[in-house]
């Protein structure tokens, strides 16, 4: 991902060798005749057998959604819930018995169900070269991601955490929108951890054993909440958040979207609404970073390594959507074994592996540290760590604020490592395009 860029950006030279590339990006080719025939089946597989009740669906248009399409939904007993203008789509509740008739319209491209989506730094910054990038290298100025907007589409961000505030106590979260029906607070803690890995500034780590700053500590954060207290959400909420990010790209200088969430792949990226939304965001000039997923192994233990760690039976072809999009910068996880050196890094067995279902694309694109990353804990729910008290990082000074940091694992936390690195790159070169950042 970063090799070409490193040839002319010395300030982030180490980043070029810190992320291991898994595949080279290629723009999607034109669909074959067989894939074209599949597209003529304009209902997602789960909807083809639906006959009773009302179903919440994502209706993709051929071109802009029109009043005629709204009327067609209404005439069939449906109810339009939300227009997604930037995505040429709408969210609607439609009787199952009317779906086939609606899909037969020439101006309808594809109809999918509103699927469920789910959620998926002590030495991390130094291990991927971010520390050197911040300091500067060979006479080049340091970069911190200053002013670059990173949209965190997740469970929210704990705005009161010191790591998300500037020296003047002003929040670095420049916008916050709640796309769920619940509270805006991050009661699951997932989004706070993700945001901290990408762009926490480590303010609260005074009195701890290390400086737990994220990769781009001066980037701006945009909090787009789509997941509930249990880390679950809907496709429509994610699409709504992506649509909002595209609309407000210039207002908040949104150059990066991080999505540490996903849903199992059930169709080609050519019809999957999340994958198509990733393409739209990329075309709007936003780098979209996605977690690969945590379905890389079964729970069957086949042996133990030299350190006594269990070896699990691996699973292939388990990349989640929207990480299956060729436009997404999809990130798998490594285990850095809590060291700075990379010679002892190994692939995390839980990290989902390619190829992608249906399209057989090589994924993930890169891997980054994703095990035992220290990042901020949410202050919105003191009970979020119950059952995982051993992963709370204890301070070494009695004057330090306790319960400020947590050890996270998963590709959910590998992805924001890369999002932070992209922000550093954009800090150094504002004209960097999403496709150039990816290759």
Residue spans of the language-model regions?
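Short amphipathic alpha-helical face segments that pack within enzyme cores
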Residues: 193-197, 240, 416-424
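Conserved G/P- and acidic residue-centered "switch" motifs that form tight phosphate/ATP-binding loops
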Residues: 154, 191, 293, 412, ...
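Second-shell loop/turn segments in exported
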Residues: 54-62, 87-89, 138-139, 180-185, ...
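Subtilisin-like serine protease catalytic core
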Residues: 30, 71, 79, 137-177, ...
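Mobile, glycine-rich extracellular loop/lid and propeptide segments
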Residues: 73, 85-86, 91-95, 101, ...
């Amino acid at each position: 991902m970063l090799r070409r860029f490193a040839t002319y950006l010395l300030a982030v030279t180490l980043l070029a060798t810190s992320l291991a590339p898994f595949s080279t990006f290629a723009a999607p080719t034109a669909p074959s005749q067989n894939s074209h025939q599949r597209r003529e089946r304009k209902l997602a597989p789960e909807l083809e057998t639906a006959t009773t009740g009302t179903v919440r669906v994502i209706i993709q248009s051929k071109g802009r959604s029109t009043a005629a399409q709204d009327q067609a939904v209404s005439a069939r007993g449906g109810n339009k819930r939300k227009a997604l203008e930037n995505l040429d789509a709408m969210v609607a509740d439609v009787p199952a018995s009317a779906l086939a008739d609606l899909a037969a319209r020439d101006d309808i491209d594809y109809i999918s169900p509103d699927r469920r989506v789910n959620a998926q730094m002590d030495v991390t910054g130094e291990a991927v070269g971010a520390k050197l990038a911040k300091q500067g290298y060979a006479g080049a100025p340091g970069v911190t991601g200053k002013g670059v907007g990173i949209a965190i589409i997740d469970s929210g961000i704990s705005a009161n955490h010191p790591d998300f505030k500037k020296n003047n106590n002003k929040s670095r979260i420049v916008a916050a929108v709640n796309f769920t029906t619940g509270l805006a607070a991050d009661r699951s803690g997932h989004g706070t951890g993700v945001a901290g890995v990408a762009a926490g500034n480590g303010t609260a780590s005074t009195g701890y054993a290390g400086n737990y700053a994220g990769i781009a500590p001066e980037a701006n954060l945009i909090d787009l909440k789509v997941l509930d207290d249990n880390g679950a959400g809907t496709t429509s909420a994610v699409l709504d958040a992506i649509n909002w990010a595209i609309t407000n790209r210039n207002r908040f200088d949104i150059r990066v979207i991080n999505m540490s969430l996903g849903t199992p792949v059930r169709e080609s990226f050519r019809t999957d609404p999340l994958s198509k939304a990733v393409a739209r965001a990329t075309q709007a000039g936003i780098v979209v970073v996605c977690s690969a997923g945590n379905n890389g192994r079964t729970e069957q233990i086949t042996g133990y390594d030299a350190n006594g760690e269990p070896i699990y039976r691996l699973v292939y072809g388990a990349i989640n959507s929207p990480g299956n999009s060729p436009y997404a910068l999809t990130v798998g996880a490594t285990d850095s074994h809590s060291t700075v050196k990379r010679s002892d890094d190994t692939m995390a067995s839980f990290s989902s592996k390619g190829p992608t279902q249906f399209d057989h694309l090589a994924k993930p694109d890169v891997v980054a540290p994703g095990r035992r990353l220290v990042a901020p804990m949410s202050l919105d729910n003191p009970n979020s760590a119950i059952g995982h008290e051993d992963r709370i990082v204890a301070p070494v000074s009695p004057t330090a604020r306790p319960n400020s940091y947590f050890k996270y694992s998963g590709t959910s936390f590998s992805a924001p490592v890369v999002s932070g690195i992209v922000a550093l790159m954009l800090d150094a070169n504002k004209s960097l395009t999403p496709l150039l950042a990816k290759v």
